[in-house]
Amino acid sequence: MRKLVLSSFIAVLLSGCATAHQQTEQEKALVGDWICHVKPAAKSPLPVEHFDYVTYRVDQTVLLRGISQIDTKEGWMRYLLQAKAKWQASDGKLSYDFTDRLFKTAHSPQVAKIIEQSPEFKELDKEFVSPCSNCGDHLDMKIKMKSPTRMTSFNTYTKETSQCRKLSAGEKTKEVKLIEKLVEEKGSI
């Protein structure tokens, strides 16, 4: 009887191991915290800059926290994106299947007041927030590892290329600190 129970237990353990996701080399390289930056396009009528603080976990979940900001003479118009997703990477392709997402304004009180009083800024604010409602639950990106701590990613939805750097353990850049501050102020998902 003991042998039967023991062999059944071992069989269950082995079958669980067989179905576990085997990480690709690219996935192993991605695990950790990254900061990514998209500079505004030189000739863009709307110079939007993005910073993303991305945490890739071994269990194939990812936590994205980012800001998009528009520099105006009145101050920064800021938007906060937070998302949770399942991720996979291989052969230069990174994909996300979103499980939760939150996109909200993160303007300073002064800038929010100016936006409220300006029809032009109000329309711009509305226009900027609305496209995310059509983002879908799946995103594919093309990635190129330049080194173990540097990569570029091309977002196939926004057609933007970001430059990414892997953060060392405990490292907090000024952009990461700003993102964490905004998440704390605005609430996390």
Where are these regions (language model features)?
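Lipid interaction determinants
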Residues: 17-90, 95-189
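Bacterial N-terminal signal peptides
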Residues: 7-15
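Positively charged n-region of N-terminal signal peptides that target proteins for export
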Residues: 1-4
